[in-house]
Amino acid sequence: MNIGFIAHNSKKILMENFCLAYKYILSKHNLYATGITGRRIEEVTNLHVYKFLPGSVGGDKQFMDMIERNCMDMVIFFYNPLITSPNTADIYAISRCCDQYNIPMATNIATA
């Protein structure tokens, strides 16, 4: 299974902790992430992560391309709903893309 990970800056530690807690399960799958999130997951878990560019410079577009080509089986996207930022549009774009291609997307620790 191909699992994609994205985390906004304020949620990167949460993503690290999540991946560390589920390291054994994640080790059986192909992991993909935007650049900085992927690097941090690798550092904490020692698992290999295929890394795209950072989201702010096109990594989110690379991520959506994988979804559109039906190469992503699920997405875990931790973002802070209390902060409006220039990256807010990527949340909606990736969410719409997942909905369009029937890819499950978790946006918090409980749904992940």
What positions do the PLM features span?
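Short, glycine-rich nucleotide/cofactor-binding loops
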Residues: 5-12, 81
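Short, acidic/small-residue loops that bind anionic groups at enzyme active sites
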Residues: 95-112
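Short internal beta-strands
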Residues: 28-37
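Mid-chain, well-packed structural core segment of small domains
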Residues: 59-100
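Short hydrophobic/aromatic-enriched beta-strand-loop microsegments
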Residues: 30, 47-57
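Histidine-anchored nucleotide/phosphate-binding helix
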Residues: 14-24
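Extreme N-terminal starter segment of soluble prokaryotic enzymes
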Residues: 1-3
